[in-house]
Curated annotation (Swiss-Prot):
It comes from the Eukaryota. CDD domains: Porin3_VDAC. It is found in: Mitochondrion outer membrane. Its main location: mitochondrion. This is Mitochondrial outer membrane protein porin of 34 kDa. It comes from Solanum tuberosum.
């Protein structure tokens, strides 16, 4: 475990990654190349039904400044400039998209042994201001995440979270959507040697009185191959196999089936990521 409570986005992240990360129903491909000067170029493509989307991302690093420039098939240009450790524990991120003149955003992150703060503001005349803060330690942490629209004078987001971490388990509780959704999650490491873990998430909506319960597990078959599986209380079951056929190059295949309506057929997804 690292020092400090981390940022608000890390509350419940272990369980979310176990239950949802890398599962997909479309086809994805990406290839990354490195130039002798340190420029990293990643070309990606994804097929969703009859729609094909692609983008090219170029990353340049100069000391503690990282610049990412991405162009997609819709002629959008995304630029992100990250300044890491301008001061101890401080990170600054400037992002904008062309031709959207209202997409500019400035974000500042600060990590301390007993706090993690992230604040962002849109670079417009009437911006949306977001603030998230966590206090505590690497064992127990309490945080909040709020957004304020300066144009309407309303809070557009108001969340709170609590997490507990020890050597082999992570438990968290989140109150989202201005108090309408309560999410409890649990992650437990069964065997560090094989990366075997189990996780569960319970989401309750007060407005609809609906519960969504998802449980899952992961296991490493060998040093290069891992499997995951999950199922929820609506009968949707998913499985995933990921193989690292060369260092940093991953092949992932996943599928989902509705056990309460098998006649609808299963959904399958493929992903291939190539890195030299």
């Amino acid at each position: 475990m690292g020092k400090g409570p981390g940022l608000y986005t890390e509350i419940g992240k272990k369980a979310r990654d176990l239950l949802y990360k890398d599962y997909q129903s479309d086809h994805k491909f990406s290839i990354t190349t490195y130039s002798p000067t340190g420029v990293v170029i990643t070309s990606s493509g994804s097929k969703k039904g009859d729609l094909f989307l692609a983008d090219v991302n170029t990353q340049l690093k100069n000391k503690n400044v990282t610049t990412d420039i991405k162009v997609d098939t819709n002629s959008n240009l995304f630029t992100t400039i990250t300044v890491d450790e301008a001061a101890p524990g401080l990170k600054t991120i400037l992002s904008f998209r062309v031709p959207d003149q209202r997409s500019g955003k400035l974000e500042v992150q600060y990590l301390h042994d007993y706090a993690g703060i992230c604040t962002s503001v849109g670079l417009t005349a009437n911006p949306i201001v977001n603030f998230s803060g966590v206090v505590g330690t690497n064992i127990i942490a309490l945080g909040t995440d709020v957004s304020f629209d300066t144009k309407t004078g309303d809070f557009t987001k108001c969340n709170a979270g609590l997490s507990f971490t020890n050597a082999d388990l992570v438990a968290s509780l989140n109150l989202n959507n201005k108090g309408d959704n309560l999410t409890a999650s649990y992650y437990h490491t069964v065997s560090p040697l094989t990366s075997t873990a189990v996780g569960a998430e319970v989401n309750h909506s007060f407005s609809t009185n609906e519960n969504i319960i998802t449980v899952g597990t992961q296991h490493r078959l060998d040093p290069l191959t891992s499997v995951k599986a999950r199922i929820n209380n609506f009968g949707k079951a998913s499985a995933l196999l990921q193989h690292e056929w060369r260092p940093k190059s991953l092949f992932t295949v996943s599928g989902e089936v509705d056990t309460k309506s098998v006649d609808k057929g299963a959904k399958f997804g493929l992903a291939l990521a190539l890195k030299p």
